[in-house]
């Protein structure tokens, strides 16, 4: 592992990866959501034989194709960054992290890449049934791509199914299904997939309402609104349900992230869920005694219910997690951060001693050092932490991002519910205020998604892999100036791609569907 690394290299490497990931996530959710919607529309065409549904599906398919292509380009760049900027990470866990990504490339990506050609160019060339199957297989392939990538990400949040090999200084997978089917992975996948469906439904609803505002393609717009409103409402409700499951898993596996999400410094029994509050700017240290939240409005005991499924359950705060001493569910006493750091340093030293003993041919000493390493490996990453305060993520960023995500999630439930009601009553074509609300709401789904990823990734700092490998020990030994240069090159490239996509989408929307 790297010692005495330049902190600016860490910051710029993180910034570059965050830039790539956030730009990439501007394209992925629309692919996931719009793809399913166009497949539903083509299914309606297949069932009814109504040519109007065919033309509707073909229009949204054009927009899907543009977005899909640029999403692939940004995703490839992100995968290469693991090797260029995060070589220590790649070495330490490449055997595990690489497996889901390999499956994604070999199975899911090839699947969607194969059938997307039939989906776009197979109209009138293959049977209706085969074309419909190709459309669904393209969307299933895209969804499977997301599955394997999110399994890899979930493993970083909750490393399972692996063991550490001190001979190679690498983690090795021993239980594939523990990695692939961990509760964190499943909750993360469905929550993320469904949030993409919301983006797709919001996009279709907003664009369709624009046609109503312009008094164009009325029948097309009403057909699209019907599908988008039903699909969006179902997706919004399911997203809320999976969000509850995700919060529970965070409480079990990443309690510091949960504490940051709630701005909770002092835990207790029957803790309330903060609805609205402001972070106190005078709070500068976890144990300075300053009240962390201002103007707090909370739901009594609800955080305990979300975290432990009991109204009076104990939920630790940041101070409790740093200082330890509280009783865990298994009856043991929680270690303090200093105790974990000491155990981590012991594990790192035991690894070094083990390798020295092997080199010297002292098998007995090697066995003793390996036993010490195994006993303390759960805290291996803490050995790289110098100050317990480093274990606290950005509370302000995590706290506000979580509330933005949740509030927008509630907004979309209401938006799709009202849209569906007006559509069923035959009033949405004349409801100008609703049309404008839907149109202006298109960016909100993207904002909610970005906020969710901020909660997930900023909230788990300082860890690249929870408790095992901190971000500071994961990077490649590069010149910070080179990372700065590529950061701005990528910023320009991604911005150009985004502008190009927006221009193409706007032109296609302005042209409208074939009548």
Name each model feature, range by range.
Residues 1-22, 49-56, 80-102, 154-190, ...:
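Membrane-interface interhelical loops and short amphipathic "cap" helices
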Residues 2-47, 55-59, 64-71:
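N-terminal signal-anchor module of multipass membrane proteins
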Residues 67-137, 154, 458-462:
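Membrane-interface helix-loop-helix modules in multi-pass inner-membrane proteins
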Residues 152, 234-342:
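Aromatic-rich transmembrane-lumenal/periplasmic boundary elements in polytopic membrane proteins
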Residues 390-453, 484-508:
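C-terminal substrate/ligand-recognition segments
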């Amino acid at each position: 592992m790297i010692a005495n690394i330049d902190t600016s290299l860490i910051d710029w490497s993180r910034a570059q990866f965050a830039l790539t990931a956030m730009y990439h996530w501007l394209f992925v959710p629309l692919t996931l959501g719009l793809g399913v919607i166009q497949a539903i529309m083509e299914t309606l065409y297949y069932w009814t034989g109504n040519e109007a549904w065919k033309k509707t599906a073909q229009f949204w398919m054009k927009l899907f194709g543009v977005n899909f292509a640029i999403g692939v380009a940004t995703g490839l760049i992100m995968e290469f960054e693991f090797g260029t900027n995060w070589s220590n990470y790649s070495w330490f866990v490449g055997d595990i992290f690489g497996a889901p990504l390999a499956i994604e490339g070999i199975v899911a990506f090839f699947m969607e890449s194969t059938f997307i050609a039939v989906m776009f160019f197979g109209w009138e060339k293959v049977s209706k049934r085969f074309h419909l199957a190709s459309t669904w297989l393209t969307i299933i392939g895209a969804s499977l791509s997301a599955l394997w990538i999110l399994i890899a990400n979930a493993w970083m949040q909750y490393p399972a199914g692996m063991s550490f090999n001190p001979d190679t200084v690498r983690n090795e997978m021993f239980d594939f299904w523990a990695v692939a089917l961990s509760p964190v992975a499943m909750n993360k996948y469905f929550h993320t997939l469904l949030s993409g469906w919301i983006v797709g439904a919001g996009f279709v609803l907003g664009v369709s309402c624009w046609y109503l505002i312009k008094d164009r393609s009325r029948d097309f717009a009403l057909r699209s609104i019907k599908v988008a409103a039903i699909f969006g409402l179902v997706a919004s409700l399911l997203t809320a349900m999976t969000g509850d499951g995700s919060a529970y898993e965070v409480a079990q596996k990443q309690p510091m992230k949960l504490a940051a999400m709630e701005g909770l410094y002092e835990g207790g029994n029957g803790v309330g869920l903060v609805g609205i509050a402001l972070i106190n700017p005078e709070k500068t240290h976890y144990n300075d005694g300053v009240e962390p939240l201002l103007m707090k409005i909370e739901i009594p005991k609800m955080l305990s219910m979300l975290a432990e499924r009991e109204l009076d359950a104990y939920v630790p705060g940041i101070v409790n997690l740093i200082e330890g001493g509280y009783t865990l569910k298994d009856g043991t006493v929680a270690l303090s951060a200093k105790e974990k750091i000491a155990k981590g340093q012991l594990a790192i030293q035991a690894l070094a001693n083990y390798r020295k003993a092997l080199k010297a041919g002292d098998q007995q000493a090697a066995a003793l050092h390996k036993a010490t390493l195994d006993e303390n490996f759960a805290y291996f990453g803490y050995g790289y932490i110098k100050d317990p305060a480093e274990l606290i993520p950005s509370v302000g960023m995590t706290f506000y991002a979580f509330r933005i995500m949740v509030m927008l999630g509630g907004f979309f439930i209401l938006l799709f519910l009202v849209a569906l009601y007006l559509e069923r009553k035959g009033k949405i074509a004349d409801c100008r205020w609703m049309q404008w609300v839907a149109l202006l709401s298109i960016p909100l789904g993207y904002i909610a998604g970005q906020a969710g990823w901020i909660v997930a990734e900023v909230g788990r700092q300082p860890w690249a892999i929870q408790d095992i490998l901190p971000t500071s020990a994961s990077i490649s030994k590069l010149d910070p100036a080179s990372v700065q240069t590529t950061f701005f090159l990528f910023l320009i490239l991604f911005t150009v791609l985004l502008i190009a996509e927006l221009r193409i989408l706007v032109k296609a929307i302005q042209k409208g569907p074939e009548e």
